[in-house]
Amino acid sequence: MRNWILLYFIVPAVLFAVSGCGGNPSSSAGTPVTSASPAPSPTPSGSPTNATVLSNVEDSPKWLTCGACGNSGGTGSVANFSFTIGMPAPSEDGQSTQFAISPSVAFTNAYFYRQQTAIPQQINSLAYAFDLYIPVGMEKAPQAIEFECQQVLDGWVYNFSWQADYPLSEWRIFDYGLKRWDATPLNFTHFTPGTWHHVVAEYHNDTTAHTVIHDALTIDGVRFPVNITHNAFFSGGGNQFTNAVQLDSNSTATPYDISVDQMTITYK
């Protein structure tokens, strides 16, 4: 498959981000939240004034991967995985990117990331938006689908991660400092196959308090405020900014793929 990449090394800052992530149930933390999702709020329109906008991020051939780094603890068996850019179908604008995993061992995962230009200051608003498509017949295959942006600034890691957990049917966020996934009040309604779904994750950080704030998650035009804060983690690494997608395999190591289109990162 075109543009298949498998790396056994990775810059330290990104490795910090994915160590401990993954779909293995043992990586879960705390008691699942069973309360109903909070009431939705109106979805903001347009980009913030003076914002930087990175468009069609998925179309680049510069996606990187990193072997077993997406597994729990960042170790273990390496799944077969791939990405393919320029897919004419399914697509919304004539070309999408397909991310695929074909594991031979249960609970192995595939992490795909892109290095962007480092952001040398506090992020007052960050929106990671994309459209996602799951083929008919693969809708029960994922253990989880994850996506994130991450800033490393002056040695501090600000990790903005979401996980759609299929067995628990809940949205979770990653606590980078404690290396665990935490439940949120948001119920996860599994993505309907054979159609596009619009996802927007909103974040910001506080570089004085060294905290990460998950502001809201929007699914198919319905915005849910979250307002959950985690501590950043000091790694001592150089300034970086990355975005990522991860596919987690289930207990039967079922292969699957997703397509992503119109991926945009907006920040100021």
Question: What are the residue ranges of the model-derived segments?
Answer:
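Bacterial N-terminal signal peptides
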Residues: 8-17
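Bacterial Sec-dependent N-terminal signal peptides
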Residues: 16-49
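Extracellular beta-strand elements of beta-rich domains used
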Residues: 57, 199, 261-265
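Extracellular glycan-recognition surfaces and repeat-rich motifs
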Residues: 61-99
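Secretory/extracellular carbohydrate-interaction modules
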Residues: 95-173, 267
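Carbohydrate-binding surfaces in secreted/extracellular proteins
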Residues: 130, 198-228
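Short, aromatic/His-centered strand-loop micro-motif at the edge of beta-sheets
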Residues: 176-198
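Flexible glycan-contacting loops in extracellular carbohydrate-active proteins
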Residues: 227-261
